Amino acid sequence: RKKTQNDYARFFDEWHERDLSDLILRDRNHPSILMWSIGNEVLEQWSSAEADTLTLEQANLILNAGHDASTLAKDGELSVQSLLTQHLAEIVRRYDSSRPITAGCNEPNPGNHLFKSGALDIIGFNYHHEWVPGVPQNFPGKPFIFSESVSALQTRGYYMMPSDTVYKAPKEWWLPYTDPTYMCSAYDNMHASWSSTHEETWDVVKHTPYVGGQYIWTGFDYIGEPTPYGFPARSSYFGIIDLAGFPKDTYYMYQSEWTAKPMLHLFPHWNWLPGQTIDLWAYYNQADEVELFINGKSQGARRKITQKEPSLLCTEYHVGWRVMYEPGEVKAVSRKGGKTVCEQTIKTAGTPHHIRLTTDYQGKETTFVAVEVVDQDGNLCPWAEDQIFFTVDGDAEIIGTDNGCQTSMENFKAPQRKAFFGKCMVVVKGNGTLKAQSPMLKTGELRIKR
């Protein structure tokens, strides 16, 4: 069934078998393939005529696909949508019987036509974690995953307080949502109308034995789907990494849960208005507690909790403090058994002074260079928006720039980029010297050699 006027449904009858077969044959020897999905949020989950219907050609294709008499009697009790699901699964198994088959379903009811087909080896829910407790009864013996999850909304470097208020944007999917900033909170406290926060979904995955895992929507921001905004927003807010490749804060929540290496991530920055009430969060692992200091004065030690206490900004996944801002420095210290595990200090940044260039990633041909506007002591200036101009020598070539801003209309191929919350990224191909210049800042320079 078509979702849009010019989508793949126009070609399905003629091309689906060849395209699906070619997909399996192309990728079946890749060890990274865990399972095959035969659909994502397809309209065939439902029988409602409100969402279009199968064409006569599609129905004939399935009902006359070589079933013998004994099979037709059994299949005749199923809907055309269920038979189509079986047909697609048969194509997959024809070329690869070693991997299970699933589908991303945003209809969690067991009456879903895809589920009714019996062709899915793994039940996949897109969102709807409130239905998870019923999975063992509704799908006995079937493995289960979140085939798509979370859809939290975040802009790197932007924070909406109080942080324990959860914002749903829009409140319902059909309602408009407006905010003059066109930004979303980088605390894990904002999500779309159909979804949840990162912590909320991960809590279900972590504590439900029969949930096999989750696919987070999304790892990276991407062009398009700028929920909850319209123009001038032109890229998504869903990623735990922004479009330029910079991690958002929630990236470190997963790091704290999924890695054994000790880590500590304190946020946000420490450049606010005098007397402003600020919520500070910390993600950590391999420690019992984290203590916060403001200009050397302890604000108390916090530890993760499993039961919500209204007086504390703490959960099972982060700790927090509500404090009054004063310029200087904040320091977090994580401890285990009374011994320090990790420390992190954030200082109030002064006037933007120079451009710092560091190699973020170096591949076979390209180098990703992180560009930061810093004060004279090297502290990131979190509100900096300077326009930065790039030049290279040697055989080097600038092939891309970005800053992670969802509303930026700057050309991705242009040799300049405006800093966004103090940062941007430039991608260089080849060897040479990269220079970054801005009228009010000391030039940054980096020699790239591979």
What are these regions, as identified by a protein language model?
Residues L280-Y284, V333-S334, E365-P382, L434-A436:
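Beta-strand-rich structural segments
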Residues R1-Y325, E329-K339:
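Extended substrate-binding grooves/exosites of carbohydrate-active enzymes
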Residues Y325-E329, T366, N431-T433:
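Extracellular Ig-like/FN3 beta-sandwich strand-entry sites
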Residues I346-K364:
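Low-complexity, Pro/Ser/Thr- and charge-rich linker/hinge segments at domain boundaries
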Residues K308-G320, T407-M425:
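Aromatic sugar-binding surface patches on proteins
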Residues K339-G350, K442-R450:
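Edge beta-strands of extracellular beta-sandwich domains
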Residues N285-R303, Q344, Q376-T407:
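Short flexible loop/turn segments that cap and initiate beta-strands
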Residues N271-Q276, Y361-T367:
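Short, solvent-exposed loop/linker segments at the N-terminal edge
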